[in-house]
């Protein structure tokens, strides 16, 4: 299912960020992740029928402009307010609590270990 895969990929982004932040802080590097919001994009454009109609309707009613979706990205890249914040999940330029699944340090460690293993299998090292 595409939606389940999409949600899992977002969970992995948060878990990976937490672990990367833990390691990067040793070198005074901060790492955060974010949710840009429900942005008007081509997401779901290949859906047809009732699902396609629902997605198009929701997009036209609730989605924000791309420029608005970029605000948190720009904020994290440029603001002094977040220069000492790392390993967090941001939404609307504020730290936001992710799902309980995203708070699981063991899952973050497992994802990191799997990522390293995949890289090694491809002949890459970190």
Language-model region placement:
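Catalytic loop of short-chain dehydrogenase/reductase
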Residues: 1-29, 35-57
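Non-catalytic terminal and boundary segments that flank Rossmann-like NAD(P)-dependent oxidoreductase
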Residues: 2, 101, 105-126
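Low-complexity, flexible helical/coil segments
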Residues: 6-13, 52, 66-73, 123-126
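C-terminal helical subdomain
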Residues: 9, 33, 57-97, 103-109, ...
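Non-transmembrane alpha-helical segments in soluble domains
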Residues: 17-21, 74, 112, 116
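Surface-exposed helix-capping loop/turn segments at secondary-structure junctions
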Residues: 24-29, 83-84, 120-126
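Glycine-rich, flexible loop/turn motifs
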Residues: 39, 98-99
């Amino acid at each position: 299912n595409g939606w389940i895969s999409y949600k899992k990929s977002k969970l992995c982004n948060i878990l990976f960020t937490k672990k990367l932040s833990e390691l990067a802080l040793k070198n005074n590097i901060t790492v955060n992740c974010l949710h840009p919001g429900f942005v008007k994009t081509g997401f779901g454009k290949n859906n047809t029928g009732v699902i396609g109609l629902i997605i198009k309707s929701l997009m036209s009613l609730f989605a924000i402009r791309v420029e608005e979706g970029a605000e948190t990205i720009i904020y994290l890249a440029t603001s002094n307010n977040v220069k000492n914040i790392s390993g967090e999940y941001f939404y609307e330029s504020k730290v936001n609590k992710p799902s309980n699944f995203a708070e699981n340090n063991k899952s973050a460690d497992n994802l990191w270990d799997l990522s390293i293993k995949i890289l090694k299998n491809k002949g890459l090292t970190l």
